[in-house]
Amino acid sequence: MFHKEAGISHLILDIILEHALNKFDPAPDRLQGAAKNFLPIIERFVAAGTRIEACLPAFPFKSANKVYKVLGSLPDKAEELALDRLNTMCARVREVYPPGLQVAIISDGITYNDTWAYGEALRQMAAQKQFMYIVFSRIKDLLDIPLPEQMSEIVYVANCTTFRRLLLNKYERADLDIDHEIASNPDTKLTYLGYRRFLESDLKYIFPRGAHRSAHSYKRDCKYLAKQMLIRGDAFAQAIKTSYPNHLRLSIHESVAGTKLSISLLNTKTGFTTPWHCSVAQLANGEWISAPMGEFRKDDRLELVYADGRPSHFREKPREGDAFGISESTASYLQRPKRLRASEYLGATLPSVPVSPGMSSPSAASTSSSGASMQGSAATTPETHSPPTFTWSGLEIVAEDNSNNASVPYGRRLIPQIMDSLAATEPERIVFSLATFSGDSLEFRPISARTFANAIDKTAWWLHNQVGRPDSIQPVGYIGPHDLRHVLLTYACVKAGYAALFLSPKNSTEGALAVLEATKCDLWINACDVSPVPLVKEVLQKRPMNVLQLPQLDELLDAVSTDPFPYTKKFDEAINDPFCFLHTSGTTGVPKPIPWSHGLIGTMDAVRLLPPGADGDLPPWTTDWKTGDTIYSSFPMSHGAGIIMNILMPALFNLHCVFGPAGVLPNINLVDALAVSTRIDIWSMVPSLVDELGETPAVLSKLKSSKFICASGGPVSPVSAGKVNEVIRVLNLTGTTEGLFMGNLIPPREDWFWFCFHPYSGFEFKQVEPDTYEHWVHRNEHWPLFQGIFHTFPEKQSINFKDLYVRHPTKPNLWAFKGRSDDLVTEAFITTHPAIKGCLVFGTGKPQAGLLIELKDPLQKTDELLDSIWETVQQANSMSRHKNQLLRDFVAFATPDKPFCRTDKGTVKRSATLKLYADYIERFYRSRNDDLGGTFDFDMSSAHSIEDNVRKILAASLPDVQEASADTDLFALGLDSLGVFAAIKTIRAATGLGDQIGPRHIYANPTIARLSAIIALLAAAAESASDTTLCERPVDDVGAQIARMIAQHKARQSFSLNAFDYVNPNHGMGLVLYFPIRDGVSYEQVFANLQAGLNRTFDLIPALSGKMTDCSEQGIGYTKGDLCVTIPPLAKADSARNRLVYKDLSAVLPSFDDLRKGGFAPSAFSDTLANFVSGGCILAVDLNHCCLDGLGAMVALKAWAENCRYLQGDQSATCGWYDPESFNHSLPEILHRQEGWARPLHEIDPGTWGFLPFFPPEDEETNPRCEKATEGSLPARPIFPLHPVWPLPRAERCLKTTMFLVTPEKLELLQQDVIADPATNGITPSISDIVQAFFWRAAIKARYRVATEIRKQKFSPDAVSILELPTDTRPHFSSRLPPTYMGSMLILNRTSMPIETLCSAETSIAKVALLLRQSAARITPSLVHDAFTLLQSLPGHRRFSTANMGLEHMHAMISNMLLFPTSEIGFGDAFFANGGVPETMRPQLERGNGRFRFLAVFPLRKDGGVELVLGTHREELEMLVTDEEFTRYARMVDTCC
């Protein structure tokens, strides 16, 4: 009998072990331990013939991470599969042992969180699915507390605190030292690490990071909470042991100590085993798999399945054609997790002490705790993406080294051994492709791993045979063609006992010799097939060295029969050996050598071990670098990025590197050729090439399929590179030659220009002045793996990089490079000007600093360009510590024959360039001190005398001009900007022309003849208009004054509106702008400036002070309803001034800071309330919408702002950009006719009426003109009621304003989800399309649900919802229309969709966005002009109607201000903070809430978020906030309901 019981017990244990969690290798001792620990428990039940009772603490609550992990808050298919698996296990036990097995699931969620609905739904699921072998228990069942038998949620939740308190009072051990247990008990440590990862990955969605929650404090809080959870978990374990003393103890976690049977709840090939932390998907073959929901969502081969109206799981779609199905080779989430050895995972961090018998290992964690999450074969438990903290002696994730069957941890692998291993295991894998031009096309020569490894060995033997093996590692200098020999030589040197030293050919001879001397380099290698560059020849003349001739590349690659050249060092032996040598750029002096040790390079390998960064969800920069990805780098091999991207990253990440073509400098044409000829996944580019790519859209579009571009080596232009980022993600990296890339994280796409760094990097940003921080690094415990710079400087504890950064205004962990702390910070900013190649501030020891600018095109110095550059300089001045440190007269330009000295990465060498321009700078300052004009007698009597005087003036700076002809180009003779400045200074003084002549006149007229002619012309004009000659020429002066008065009177003539103006009915366009006020500034000062600035704007644009009136019925061609603008005549202009109204509401409304903190909530105050609150100004503006559209309003505000700045002392604020014809409402009709767009009405497609807010005349509705639709014709005008009046009477029940926020992260998620949706058919909708589609669908769904669910309305299948989008037609109308034209140029882009389709769960946002994109494509110049023709033909304006008028319908209008450039509106910084730029600008919505359905998308927030505002009834709002799709992306921030 005893043997029978033992046999049955073994069978039962075997069945349970088939369901075991095996995330560590099943070591024999562990299996023996399982039998030893658990067989006696099972045998007791079997001997008694009773049912085996097991308990499993599990199923606490659904993860809070609904962005990436799970589908919702309630159990779904994942839980169902887990319960079924447990139930099936019990059923199988019953087959061999009839009493069977029952599992009691003890919901431990209450130990850590208040949960009820999840547990109740789980019980209902078990009952519905008849999982009869599973029972449930809650924590209250473990405690002796009187409660009702049938307990409600209210009673249960009300007693949560009591439950926890009783648990701790009864079972907490006073002598528990939790830190000691973590250090000594492997099970406790496993659970602790799991808790930390769970907390760090999930709590950020409950308690988002912000200004008052730093990365450090967040991590610290999570560690504290994890320990508290362990303490409660220990008490919970003791309670279970007490309540279930004889039960078989199951656990969802690995148990190193073997005290629990570890169970895998999900039987999938991935490592995701806890259903409350993942989602499941069913493949086409019926197999179930598990992974984070976010991974499934990205795979367009999967579709989301709903059950009972809630998302349940994913399902593989039917395969189409030859499309690949989902398999391990085509889906990254299916890569099997690699089992870790428990000893490797924990052993190195645990001292040799026995497991404490008193510590009951908690198993109530809500996440798996076994190891770090890794992609690919090194993954263990990828339920979170945060590997535990570890030190050099701690956790080491391992990679297989198949060459010696040893496991080598990431961060401790040696580059030569990685390649030898690859050649042995995957000899045919292509590791390099060598590009060559064949005619105009590229050809590629593939290099396999075997061929490459053989070539390395051949090169190593060649070197060894030439010079033998040195006693210690010696440098080998090399400058050669940009081909694969750089890579081969690097590897070969390491194997042969040397280290390659790559010198830049741009070094000076002095600099190169300094590096060679510092490294004691006595061995030089030249490529045998090319002549050495001049630098090498000069160096070899001054420093005798042993010179070798490196064979040609083809010879080295022909290495089939080469014997292996072994490299057998261990990492600990090689850690401090130099892998190669580079050197500093020499920007501030002679370059210095930098050895790259194997330890330093190991930090690049260890990046994959980093947990998520400062914001939790920001991944390390190498996250998306996948095996087999193709990379191309434009960096030279003498630059650190060239070594990293061509040698290190391909080896460490198994990349396929494209190299060459040799002899071709990377340029935009080569990028174009590469993009066309092969697929490049990862581009690594110098900053200048990234910028050029942004200005070359034809090439940029060809890179769209690539993953991203790594930009490094210096700052990129935020404008040009920003254009690149819109097409292909720009990964903006920063690093140092001494430390490589340390801690770079990937910020959200919209923040691509900013840097974010991982806490392990040890970076500190010390504030040195407001908005300026100095970059430091401090050694920490993670330095061996993540702080490479301390491998280079092992003696240092802290290092000042001397780089300056600016902090993101709303995201405190994001930083932007500002400059060097030992340079003036203005240089970095000024260089962002698109026309500037580089600049240097000079003048140390001088009373006034100067600026030397190197232009990209030194011959283009137009007046507009110079003004534009000066604006940038002024902005730089405002950012600097000292105001106005650069003056316009102290800006000079580099000469074409003396380009700035630069490093390989394109950075300006300051000292070398200043030395090059030393004489120039001295002449520059002399030219500012000399005053030739006071003594020069300029004869203006004739053209000849003017030319003679010009020649003499120029000769002071340009002696050769004396002998040149009058038509010789002065710049060809050598005239530079100093000479230009000196000449202009003299001419101004000698001729009396003053500022009427400037440097631009010389640049535009660069010969003596042309310059003399322009001087004569300017002098004549000055003479006729001079105010100083009133007595001498009274007639001419009166004439000029009369001309000015005529112009002013013309500008005040009343005018009628044109046909386009009536697209907007006669009503006000209300806008509200929010400005912070500087400390110490009074409301009266601000008001006076605004009032005076507005009056000055009325002088500039008199029509703004006018009044809209009805046209006279006696007028020729009068049509009823015609309107005109009447403007006060000049004599009564003062009557229209002082329009602003002063209100001090500081005692009524909250302060500006409070309003800002509340997001300027609409409910905080009425639209009618303005304008002063404590600390700020609320400026309410009302413009007539019939006379101006949105862009016209923008022009008006910009002019007002500039006039306010002028009154504050900004003499450049002259509104010179404003075209005088901007308010000429006759222009559209003139251009329409003169450009030939007018045509007969019968030729116009009747579908054009669909773009207008007017119904066709009655006779046309019954007798349409264009009966026959042709291919490509417009869709029919959508049908909606004609409203008899405008405006409609106000509804009795008005809508209430509600505001939602889509955060930057949610906006990116929305965009990603839409782009990934197959409904887009490969077309990428714009962000405006996506936001509008999202908003339209959500608003109509809410109304539809109210109508159908509450009002019980029914809709026919053909009932449609119409979306009206006011659309600016300026880009389509005429290039001759002034860009600042202010009149209305709008049409209505209408899109319609059946209501049931729009609101259906089967309709995606992507489908709606694609429809909007297709609708926008219908707008063409022909359509716009046809619309204008129809508007001109209207007999009146009484048939005005839009679909959104009224409240009881299913239509909407969206006013999309998303891309409204509020930053262009700057009211000055004398009184306003923030430069007078409004913090936000919004339309006044209250006025329309009773008359039409109006949705508004506010301008993009500074943090990249989007605010959506609409009017709702309360029941509609309730539907919105319960819409899972809508609330996935948007959250309500304010409502007036």
Curated annotation (Swiss-Prot):
Entry-linked InterPro entries: ACP-like_sf, AMP-binding_CS, AMP-dep_synth/lig_dom, ANL_N_sf, CAT-like_dom_sf, Isocyanide_synthase_DIT1, PP-bd_ACP
Isomerase as UniProt keyword: yes
Composition bias, Polar residues: 382-391
A family per Pfam: DIT1_PvcA
Annotated ranges, domain Carrier: 941-1019
Pathway: Secondary metabolite biosynthesis
Stretches the record annotates as Disordered: 351-391
Region (Isocyanide synthase domain): 1-502
Gene Ontology MF terms: isomerase activity; ligase activity; oxidoreductase activity
Deleted gene: phenotype: Does not affect the xanthocillin production. Abolishes the production of fumivalines and fumicicolins.
Spans annotated as Transferase: 1293-1526
Low complexity bias: start-end ranges: 352-381
Residues with O-(pantetheine 4'-phosphoryl)serine modification: S977
PROSITE patterns: AMP_BINDING (PS00455), CARRIER (PS50075)
Record EC number: 1.-.-.-, 6.3.2.-
Keywords associated with the record: Isomerase, Ligase, Oxidoreductase, Phosphopantetheine, Phosphoprotein
Keyword Iron recorded: no
Record's note on what induces expression: Expressed in copper depleted conditions via the regulation of the macA transcription factor.
Region Adenylation: start-end pairs: 573-752
Function: Isocyanide synthase-NRPS hybrid; part of the crm gene cluster that mediates the biosynthesis of a yet unidentified copper-responsive metabolite. Converts valine into valine isocyanide that then contributes to two distinct biosynthetic pathways under copper-limiting conditions. Reaction of valine isocyanide with the imine intermediate of festuclavine results in formation of the amide bond in fumivaline A. In addition, valine isocyanide contributes to biosynthesis of a family of acylated sugar alcohols, the D-mannitol-derived fumicicolins.
Family in the record: In the N-terminal section; belongs to the isocyanide synthase family.
Name used for this protein in its record: Isocyanide synthase-NRPS hybrid crmA
Originating species: Aspergillus fumigatus (strain ATCC MYA-4609 / CBS 101355 / FGSC A1100 / Af293) (Neosartorya fumigata)
